[in-house]
């Protein structure tokens, strides 16, 4: 029963706390539009992915605050583990007490949810809202835009103080994606994501996300710096007063134990 309540709220965890910073200012269209070939747009997405890819292991603490209309805000804390080599992924909730021990495991493109109160594993889809928030598994995982979407250039816009390239992304056939259509605003100078809007196939806007803070950290496995969003703000476009804030903390890129990404390991941490 508790797992249903948690899943009814929304997405995968990473580390959120609600801040009072306003979202980026509305975009203003620029007169000139840069020219990119289809191949160059794919390379641009690969660059976005590569800047965030560790090529090794990842551990972070996440703070999440979920706000819903007419309800008291709920705060979650979770540990997030990733392994680039085989794209394995774990989210383990540590707070609140009612959700502690619940977790998600991704193995071989299958996403599983575990609830220790019933000792049962259930398979989930990429569209699953994680841990009672408005986030999805992909929000906490490595960026794979070039693998999952076909890009189209819409133009160039001013987004607050940033010059942004605006792309429309359509999901590739045969993939289980949380959102089949995505509109993306990329910082022209860094290629970091500034803003993201996600749509249903019908064209209905479902969610708007802002990425106001990015941080770089040196990766020993990659021998260069990688970037990750320290703060992400999700705004539900269907239930207008619902929002989620995620803060990513204490990132550690050292190697994790070999048997960590298993059901047995997650169950042992849930006892």
Where are these regions (language model features)?
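N-terminal post-signal-peptidase region of extra-cytosolic proteins
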Residues: 90-95
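Bacterial N-terminal signal peptides
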Residues: 8-22
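Gly/Pro-enriched, hydrophobic low-complexity segments
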Residues: 120-124, 140, 144, 160-263
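N-terminal secretory signal peptides that target proteins for export/translocation
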Residues: 1-4
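Flexible, processing/modification-adjacent segments and terminal tails
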Residues: 30-57, 63, 72-74, 97-180, ...
């Amino acid at each position: 029963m508790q797992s249903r309540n948690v899943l009814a709220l929304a997405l995968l965890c990473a580390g959120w706390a609600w801040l009072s910073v306003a979202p980026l200012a509305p975009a203003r269209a620029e007169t000139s539009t840069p020219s990119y070939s289809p191949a160059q747009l794919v390379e641009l997405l690969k660059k976005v992915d590569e800047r965030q890819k560790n090529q090794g292991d990842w551990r972070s603490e996440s703070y999440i605050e979920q706000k819903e209309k007419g309800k008291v805000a709920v705060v979650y804390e979770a540990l997030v583990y990733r392994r680039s080599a085989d794209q394995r992924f774990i989210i383990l909730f540590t707070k609140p007490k009612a959700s502690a021990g619940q977790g998600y495991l991704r193995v071989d493109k299958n996403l599983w949810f575990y609830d220790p109160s019933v000792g049962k594993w259930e398979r989930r889809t990429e569209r699953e809202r994680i841990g009672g928030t408005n986030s999805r598994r992909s929000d906490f995982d490595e960026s794979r835009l070039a693998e999952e979407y076909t890009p189209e250039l819409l133009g160039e816009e001013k987004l607050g103080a940033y010059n942004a390239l605006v792309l429309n992304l359509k999901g590739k056939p045969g993939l289980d994606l949380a959102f089949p259509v995505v509109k993306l605003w990329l910082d022209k100078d860094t290629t970091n994501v500034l803003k993201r809007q996600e749509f249903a196939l019908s064209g209905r806007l479902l969610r708007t996300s802002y990425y106001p803070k990015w941080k770089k950290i040196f990766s020993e496995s990659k021998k260069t710096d990688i970037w990750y969003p320290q703060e992400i703000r999700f705004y539900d476009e269907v239930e207008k007063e619902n929002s989620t804030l995620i803060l990513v903390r204490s990132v550690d890129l050292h190697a994790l134990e070999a048997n960590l990404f298993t059901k047995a390991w997650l169950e042992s941490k849930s006892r």
